[in-house]
Amino acid sequence: MKPIEKLFVGNSLDSVAVLQKALDFGIDFLGDEWKNVNRSEVTVTRILGGQSNHMFHVTSSTSATSFVLRIHREGQSQFDTDIVNFAIFSERGLGPKLYGFFEEGRMEEFLPSVTLKLNDVLNTEISRKIGAAFPKYHAINVPVSKSRRCFQIMRESLHDYQALGGGDFAIFPTVVTYSEHPKSISIKDLLTEIDLLEKWSIDLFENTLVFCHNDLTSSNILQLNSTGELVFIDWENASYNWRGYDLAMHLSEAAVIRNTCPPGIVINEELTDNPPNLQAFCEAYVDSENKIKGLLSSNISSQVNSLIQECKFFWPITHLFWACFIMKLGLFECNREIKLNAQAREHLAVYFHLRSRSEMIYKKLSEN
């Protein structure tokens, strides 16, 4: 644990050390309005919900501008990527203002808002707003590698899984009732699946590469108190990927309920097989994208239907991604008591259940 993280995590938030450091940040990045603030006038509170970083809201009893301190847990490479992404979105008004960055984190604008919950993203009107917001982000050109990352991360995860001693993986889900999966699968067979799905994706959708969030769960969406506008946050996992993968990741995550009982997740089969907002979500996306590009389409319904098929094609791939990633995490010593392997089995069961649909879409679109 590095010094800044250790300071804020290892001490009481009303300790002299924490309050003084927060005051120093205010003076360093916001200048005069914080220079006359006394340490006794500063309050630091933790913002809950950050999975890959610690977040703290810093205020004072004066009129000085409040701010958020975001202290990263990741390595330097991912931290640098997140800073670049955040700065670009901030400049375009698609996120909080960036006040400054420092080793291990950044200081940003505090946006009075609420974080969406799972039930919120299942609401049709909110789902439409999310669909309409996506193209604003997908339209941005970000100066990072344009190579698609999802399948490469799967391969890297399986390589690490094998290096940690992992072998053939038994599939016996305890929550979902899908039965199309094999009883077990080898690393070799998983890599074959990855290669095949990557080929299908390239054949069909190579012209849809955009900058993707890759993890837009409800907890990564803010709704501003002032306007009701939605803001996507936490871009540390962002990279270029296929558009449909990004959309399917968001939609598929809306069917995943996280809890404290083993295996830690419940994947809702009805929401997986018959997502209620898919049509409305895709309609809003197409309408927003056309407006951004200045297009007047004569066949909106065709565009919407194509996007729906695109999302359905990538849907099982998101579950394959999480299965491979979680298989690796499950072998880390610190995770052994969490039983992450059980979650990987659930995701693999969903993958094999939906895989045939992706194959049908591939064959149909390949004929056209």
From Swiss-Prot:
User: A Gene Ontology molecular-function term?
Assistant: ethanolamine kinase activity
Cofactor(s) in the UniProt record: Mg(2+)
What's any one GO cellular component for it?
cytoplasm
Q: Name one Pfam family in it.
A: Choline_kinase
Substrates-to-products reaction catalysed: choline + ATP = phosphocholine + ADP + H(+)
Cystine pairings recorded for this chain = none
**Keywords of this entry:** ATP-binding, Kinase, Lipid biosynthesis, Lipid metabolism, Magnesium, Nucleotide-binding, Phospholipid biosynthesis, Phospholipid metabolism, Transferase
Report the superkingdom from the record: Eukaryota
- Stored InterPro entries: Kinase-like_dom_sf (IPR011009)
Q: What is its EC number?
A: 2.7.1.32
Q: Name the top EC class.
A: transferase
Please, one GO biological process term?
CDP-choline pathway
Which family does the UniProt entry place this protein in?
Belongs to the choline/ethanolamine kinase family.
Protein known as: Putative choline kinase B3
